[in-house]
Amino acid sequence: MVKITDVARHAGVSPSTVSYALSGKRPISEETRQRVEAAIRELGYRPHAGARALASSKSNVLALVVPLRAGIHVPVVMQFAVSVVTTARRYDHDVLLLTQEEGDDGLRRVADTALVDALIVMDVQLQDPRLPLLRSLDRPSVMIGFPSEPAGLTCIDLDFKTAGAVCVEHLARLGHRVVALVGSPPEVYVRGTAFAQRVVQGFTAAADRAGLASSVHPCESAPGAARAVAERLLREQPALTGVVVHNEPLLEPLIDAFEQLGLRVPADLSVTAICPEETAAGLRVPITSVALPSAELGERAVELLMRKLAGTDVPEATLLPPRLTERASTAPREAP
């Protein structure tokens, strides 16, 4: 392993001069700095993270705060995490993943040390108890999600309210008059999780505008729950012809359940979803869907954080517009 003394010997300077070139703590001549940088490149030297943090008061580490609470769909969370880690490496930063439900205490524990330079916070609630602390920290943060009162924070997310509306509007254009939303697990709504609540708001408002009969059904993600919710929907809304699904693991089991109950997709029932594009496109019946742009959201969250670390102004709110892709799961409603 290359040491700082090897770099110093190669550049013809003292180890302390190499340290000053890395940290900028003391001025050195441009010619000396270039010799040191050339030696670092030639030898492939990488400063020890702890030493670099002590020298520069920076750790080059970002915290990704994503509590793995009940009802969270872990594969989607991991898509966000991979995007954050990959983008952070482009900026020579590593990522510390915090998954425990520790609330303010966990955030404060990390923020009060030199472990991380900045934070990305996920699984945002409408009335998120972490907001006062995030506003008071001397370290920058970005939230992937929008609380009810986002003033003074930097937030980015898919426009989930419009996403819910877009799905309903698509069904309405196809002539469907009775629609239902099969949503996230009940505990997600009990917590007031922002993205799930906004889908409900958009779905309900769009249905009301179009004069559609509508209902909302939170549902567990276990495959066995699909049959129960399908039976309940058909019992409570026998004229149902359009369904919006915001529960990725339930998509295929739900289509299977409807077909077992005698409804063909899309001949008898049109289904749309808000989910990752590869999920929608890869099912037995490809699903008309609004894509969940987890890779773009993770990438742009890191980019916002890097700009904040550099002292550059960033917008407080960034909402990505939803994009609906029509596939084989929706069709015009057959005339009664």
Give names to the regions the model predicted:
Residues 112-118, 236-241:
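Short acidic/histidine-rich motifs immediately flanking catalytic phosphotransfer sites
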Residues 14, 60, 117, 177-178, ...:
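Short acidic/polar active-site loop segments enriched in Thr and Asp
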Residues 50, 105-108, 129-130, 225-229:
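Short acidic active-site motifs
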Residues 30, 38, 45-108, 118, ...:
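Amphipathic helical "hinge" segments at domain boundaries
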Residues 100-104, 122-127, 248-250:
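Short beta->alpha connector loops
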Residues 17-20, 57-70, 178-188:
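Short beta-strand segments enriched in small/hydrophobic residues
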Residues 86-90, 136-143, 147-336:
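Bacterial carbohydrate/catabolite-sensing allosteric modules
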